[in-house]
């Protein structure tokens, strides 16, 4: 199946996106696409100080030449992140109140408005957003458009994330990184000439974000096995069937070669379409992304700089590859189910553990809340482990067919220019190890560490990673 056929198939299962235009020079078609999707509407181009000169200013001129009434708003920040105040800022941009939007943008101590209070009637929308940028700007436009009961167009400037086409926006609210429900854009425009010229570190981040779908897929297989989150066939096949091919040219990605960049961007976009089909981020992330959430929520910095999503995910992905390497060394046909069930804590004990682990975290109740959602009683654990013991050889074989080894993934990241050691983003290996209890508990989503806790082999798959000769030897 070629790219055009894959994209057509993906659009057929997409619930929100109807147009995906990718190729060299296609940004010039954006006004035409806008008119097809939003006839007679006003366009409001949202860019930042980096993407405005790269493409935003030219698009603004093209829209006006096409007879489309057009405004623009440029976020005057060298660095900014997907924080709630910028959602509120973008809400005001949709309504044409640029003065109030600028006040929020420049406010050092903005008081966050409760999410449910930001929904507006569609008639309050002044125009339709055209997002010109990468992950953060796209997520801001996605959620603000949803607040106003309308869609938007996303014009990508880098192959840095899978969020362009994903269902939901990842935003920090109340100190916690959360995924807010909102539809993906109705149209995505990806000009490979623009995207291939993006800073190399952004492209490397996108490569790591796409590679994270390898361990995320394996963890979804485990969740499917336990019955907690069954695999959605369309969402699985539209991405996983081609993932190896999309990751096959890390050298071309590093060199900015057009075909390698096009393959990378297509893979990232299909990942988003998978999330649309599943109405969940399950097809694209699991523990690998939770390391990134921890770093975001604790404002981890390296040389004074917050690290990109993809860079953080790179280290989470490598760590989970190492966990699976250790998992495959276990003979779970020898599991003592009775002993594991006897050792399994009560809900109250797990809630207490969650409160203790997250005691000094920016969201201290997060572990308590999430472990409560996914806790299984002893009967459930017995049934799960009994099946695991009986079917481990088959499950192990399927997981091995999905996974990359730590060594293979590290080599791919090295060649693509992505971080391949925690030190590359300013983390010590001890700090990374300390994150694992948080990762296991901080999301209701069933993960491989949950399986290890229930089967009493958590230490066997974690400790060797940080021991002498381990992947992250301390």
Annotate each predicted stretch with a short phrase.
Residues 59, 137-150, 295:
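Short Gly/Thr/Asp-enriched flexible loops that form oxyanion-binding sites at enzyme active sites
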Residues 143-245:
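A glycine/threonine-rich phosphate-anchoring loop and its flanking beta-alpha core
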Residues 2-7, 330-474:
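C-terminal charged capping/lid subdomain of soluble metabolic enzymes
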Residues 1-128:
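ATP/NTP phosphate-donor binding region
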Residues 240-330:
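A conserved active-site cap/scaffold subdomain adjacent to cofactor or substrate pockets
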Residues 54-55, 134-143, 161-164:
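Short glycine/serine/threonine-rich phosphate/pyrophosphate-binding segments
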């Amino acid at each position: 199946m070629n790219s055009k056929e894959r994209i057509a198939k993906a659009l057929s299962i997409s619930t929100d996106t109807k147009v995906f235009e990718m190729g060299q020079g296609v940004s010039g078609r954006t006004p035409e696409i806008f008119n097809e999707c939003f006839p007679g509407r006003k366009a409001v181009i949202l860019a930042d100080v980096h993407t405005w000169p790269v493409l935003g200013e030219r698009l603004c001129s093209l829209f006006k030449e096409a007879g489309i009434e057009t405004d623009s708003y440029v976020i005057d920040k060298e660095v900014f992140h997907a924080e709630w105040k910028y959602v509120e800022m973008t809400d005001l941009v949709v309504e044409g109140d640029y003065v109030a939007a600028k006040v929020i943008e420049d406010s050092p101590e903005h008081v966050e408005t409760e999410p449910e209070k930001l929904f507006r009637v569609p008639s309050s929308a002044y125009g339709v957003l055209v997002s010109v940028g990468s992950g953060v700007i796209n997520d801001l436009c996605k959620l603000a458009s949803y607040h106003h009961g309308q869609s938007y167009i996303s014009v990508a400037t880098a192959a840095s994330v899978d969020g362009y086409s994903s269902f939901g926006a990842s935003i920090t609210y109340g100190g916690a990184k959360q995924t807010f429900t909102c539809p993906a854009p109705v149209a995505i425009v990806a000009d490979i000439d623009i995207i291939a010229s993006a800073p190399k570190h952004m492209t490397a981040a996108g490569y790591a974000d796409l590679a994270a779908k390898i361990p995320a897929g394996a963890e979804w297989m485990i969740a499917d096995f336990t019955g907690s989150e069954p695999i959605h066939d369309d969402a699985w096949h539209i991405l996983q069937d081609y993932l190896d091919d999309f990751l096959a040219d890390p050298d071309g990605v590093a060199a900015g070669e057009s075909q390698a960049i096009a393959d990378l961007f297509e893979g990232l976009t299909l990942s988003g379409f998978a999330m649309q089909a599943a109405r969940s981020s399950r097809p694209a992330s699991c523990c690998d992304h939770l390391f990134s959430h921890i770093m975001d929520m604790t404002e981890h910095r390296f040389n004074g700089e917050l690290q990109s999503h993809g860079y953080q995910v790179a280290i989470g992905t490598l760590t989970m590859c190492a966990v699976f390497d250790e998992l495959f060394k276990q003979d779970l046909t020898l599991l003592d189910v009775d002993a594991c069930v006897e050792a399994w804590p009560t809900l109250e004990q797990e809630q207490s553990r969650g409160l203790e682990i997250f005691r000094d975290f920016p969201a201290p109740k997060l572990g308590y809340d999430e472990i409560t959602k996914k806790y299984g009683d002893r009967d459930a654990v017995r049934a799960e482990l009994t099946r695991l013991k009986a079917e481990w050889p088959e499950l192990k074989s399927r997981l091995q067919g999905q996974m990359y080894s730590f060594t293979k993934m590290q080599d791919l990241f090295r060649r693509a220019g992505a971080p391949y050691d925690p030190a590359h983003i300013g983390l010590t290996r001890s700090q990374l190890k300390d994150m694992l209890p948080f990762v296991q508990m901080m999301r209701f989503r069933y993960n491989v560490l949950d399986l290890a806790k229930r089967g009493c082999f958590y230490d066997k798959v974690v400790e060797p990673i940080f021991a002498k000769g381990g992947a992250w030897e301390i």
